[in-house]
Swiss-Prot record:
Superkingdom, natural source: Eukaryota
Keywords linked to the UniProt accession: Carboxypeptidase, Disulfide bond, Glycoprotein, Hydrolase, Protease, Signal, Vacuole, Zymogen
Gene from which this protein is expressed: cpyA
PROSITE patterns reported for this sequence: CARBOXYPEPT_SER_SER (PS00131)
Protein's recorded name: Carboxypeptidase Y homolog A
GO molecular function: serine-type carboxypeptidase activity
GO biological process: proteolysis
Key word Hydrolase present: yes
Native source organism of the sequence: Talaromyces marneffei (strain ATCC 18224 / CBS 334.59 / QM 7333) (Penicillium marneffei)
Gene3D superfamilies: 1.10.287.410, alpha/beta hydrolase
Length: 555
């Protein structure tokens, strides 16, 4: 059981983040590495010795209480010393004169219009008065990234809560006056969307020589794309506080988009989509629900795309054993003994996840995350195989991909920081403090799939998955989308997978995956793609993306 406590201490949720392959560290190392001060009430609560948490523990199931007790007994002083909120990133705020535009949320909030009944109402809904949006035109030639494309970067500021979210916008290479706009979100929680920009689907990658390399398969080939670093203290974003649950970030994203489209009304009437991967399986249902809840909005949300996401842990965790043991289309990674162990652990894991679903309390959701990650992810992780690509060992750094180190080196150059207006002193691909915070808030195992039926009543949803990923594998993603209860469930469940082929270039007819679609729900399996489909299969990625935003499965 020592592995359980170690997983707790470094952030058990890191097992299913993008990217974090670390498994074992000495407790003393971890405590020293993560020790920071915090006055947060949650930190104070969780730092209390477990024997003092009598009222909280009364509500636990026996399984959840056992997990907490095991951790307490093995490391009796540990929870007194581990903080649960990250310290602010070092930063220097640039003067207002540095920015080309500043959009004041209070000004937008005070715009009133007359409705069809002759009554006065606000032009857009939501609480915006504490937010500002700072905008800087990026000189493409200064960075060598898509030099013929308009780019903007800046910050959304929540002045009341000292939160500052960084974004970087790239206009479409094709027809920016008519092409849709897409918000891209990486997961983690705690990983920068600039990783998606330079590692997966943006206009350039970064080579070994720390120079940009043109990407012909960029998603801004036929769409304008916003890459957002969220939650705060991720990438170039920063705050004096911290965010530790998905719902808290949803209102920030709504404010960002509202003010962005107010500053750039030329994009506001175009179709808008939200796309992301991994922990974005939590983010996207929450963010889309927040946007759709505002009937008066300037965000023309048309669909959402979730790639290799974690959305329904109860269903998805069942498919770690099949994927690791040879039933997912690739050779087995684990031996029969390890596979039997995972089979034996599944019942307890799902029982604990169900308790989390029923209460949505940290006191049941945290133990579910700890136990299930240790029992069902741990055996695979300990083999050293890449959790994001079952075909490969984890090589290079703890992130498994050397290219990520090139990206960090590039983004930490003074000329790059200046060109995009970054206000933090340094860039990191992932902030593991944030990852731990979300775990201990109970966010990891919460049932975000319950938001999807409401979204499906209004807009289409695409669930896509590279079939070589282990951590958020295609078996689990297909299973939860098949099981989802919504108004079109019966028709969707009866729909069979069909071949997905390239349709209109020199590779016409090439099979790139499988697809099933009915009503507003579509699932895709992408052959040969790992956790980051655009990285492994760039041509196939752009193919399905262009056809999706073009309306092939959304009409």
């Amino acid at each position: 059981m020592r592995g359980l406590a170690t997983t707790l201490l470094i952030g058990a949720a890191a097992a299913a983040t993008y990217p974090a392959q670390q498994v074992l560290k000495a407790p003393e190392e971890v405590l020293e590495k993560t020790h920071k001060t915090s006055s947060s009430s949650l930190a104070e609560t969780l730092a209390r010795p477990l024997h003092e948490l009598n009222e909280e523990l009364k509500s636990l199931t026996a399984e959840a209480e056992e997990v907490w007790e095991q951790v307490s007994n093995m490391f009796p002083g540990a929870l007194d010393n581990i903080p649960f909120f990250s310290s602010p990133k070092k930063h220097t705020r640039r003067p207002d004169s540095h920015w080309d535009h500043i959009v004041r949320g209070a000004d937008v909030q005070n715009i009133w219009v007359e409705n069809e009944n002759g009554e006065k109402e606000r032009e857009v809904g939501g609480r915006l008065e504490t937010f500002d949006l700072r905008v800087k035109a990026v000189d493409p030639s200064s960075l060598g990234i898509d030099p013929d494309v308009k780019q903007y970067s800046g910050y959304l500021d929540d002045n009341e809560n000292d939160k500052h979210l960084f974004y970087w916008f790239f206009e479409s290479r094709n027809d920016p006056k008519n092409d849709p706009v897409v918000l891209w979100l990486n997961g983690g929680p705690g990983c920068s969307s600039l990783t998606g920009l330079f590692f997966e689907l943006g206009p350039s990658s970064i080579g070994k020589n720390i120079k940009p390399i043109y990407n012909p398969y960029s998603w801004n080939s036929n769409a304008s794309v916003i890459f957002l670093d969220q939650p705060v203290n991720v990438g170039f974003s920063y705050s004096g506080n911290s965010v530790s649950e998905t719902s808290a970030a949803a209102k920030d994203v709504y404010a960002l988009l509202t003010l962005f489209f107010k500053q750039f009304p030329e994009y506001a009437t175009q179709d808008f989509h939200i796309a992301g991967e991994s922990y974005a399986g939590h983010y996207i249902p929450s963010f889309a629900s927040e946007i759709l809840s505002h009937k008066k909005r300037n965000i023309n949300l048309k669909s959402v795309l979730i790639g290799n996401g974690l959305t329904d842990g109860f269903t998805q965790y069942e498919y770690y054993r099949p994927m690791a043991c040879g039933d997912g289309g690739y050779p087995a990674v684990l031996d029969e003994s390890a596979c039997r162990s995972m089979d034996n652990a599944l019942g307890r894991c799902q029982s604990m996840i169900q308790s989390c679903y029923d209460s949505e309390s940290a006191w049941t959701c945290v133990p579910a995350s700890i136990y299930c990650n240790n029992a069902l992810l741990g055996p695979y992780q300990r083999t050293g195989q890449n959790v994001y690509d079952i075909r490969k060992p984890c090589e290079g750094s703890s992130l498994c991909y050397a290219d990520l180190e090139y990206i960090s080196t590039y983004l930490n150059q003074a000329e790059v920081l200046k060109a995009v207006g970054a206000e933090v002193d340094s860039f990191d691909s992932c902030n593991f403090d944030i990852n731990r915070n979300f775990l201990f808030k109970g966010d990891w195992m919460k049932p975000f799939h319950k938001l999807v039926p409401g979204i499906l009543e209004e807009i289409p949803v695409l669930i896509y998955a590279g079939d070589a990923d282990f951590i958020c594998n295609w078996l689990g993603n297909k299973a939860w989308s098949d099981a989802l209860e919504w108004s079109g469930h019966e028709e969707y469940a009866a729909t069979e997978l069909e071949d997905l082929e390239i349709v209109d270039n020199e590779h016409k007819g090439k099979k790139i995956g499988q697809v099933k679609s009915s009503g507003n729900l579509t699932f895709m399996r992408l052959f040969g793609g790992g956790h980051m489909v655009p990285y492994d299969q760039p041509e196939a990625s752009l193919e399905f993306f262009n056809r999706w935003i073009g309306g092939e499965w959304t009409k």
